[in-house]
């Protein structure tokens, strides 16, 4: 949620227009919050949860296909590699934000750039702007 006045950062199930996730299983966990026709922007990275690490379970197959079958519009890419291309794997969040910005035609690029400048320490701004731009181009 964003805007001049946010009354609560929590949304009800079935109301999210977008879900951004750092890995596919995370997207699957939160899909019930997505509205019909909503979009999921997810990194294709797989992070094994503890049951997979211990051998008690296998990482679920075909997550992107399952998300699409559930009615989500899925934009799945290797955003981690894009962040590394920008200069740091830690920038994957900004890469995802850059990708998200492509779906908001009514928010000018300059506003996104100003927001980055407002929250990112100066020594990391160049990296974050590069990550954001690469995300937009993904």
Provide a role label for each language-model segment:
Residues 1-138:
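Active-site cofactor/cluster-binding pocket
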């Amino acid at each position: 949620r964003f805007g001049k006045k946010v009354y609560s950062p929590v949304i009800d199930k079935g109301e999210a227009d977008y879900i951004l996730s750092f890995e596919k299983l995370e997207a699957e966990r939160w899909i019930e919050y997505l509205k019909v026709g909503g979009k999921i922007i997810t990194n294709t990275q797989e992070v094994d949860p503890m049951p997979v690490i211990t051998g008690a379970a296998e990482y679920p197959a075909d997550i992107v296909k399952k998300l699409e079958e559930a009615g989500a519009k899925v934009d799945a890419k290797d955003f981690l590699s894009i962040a590394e291309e920008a200069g740091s794997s830690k920038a994957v969040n900004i890469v995802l934000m850059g990708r998200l910005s492509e779906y908001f035609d009514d928010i000018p690029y300059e506003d996104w750039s100003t927001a980055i400048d407002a929250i990112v320490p100066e020594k990391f701004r160049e990296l974050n702007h590069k990550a954001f731009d690469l995300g937009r181009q993904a």
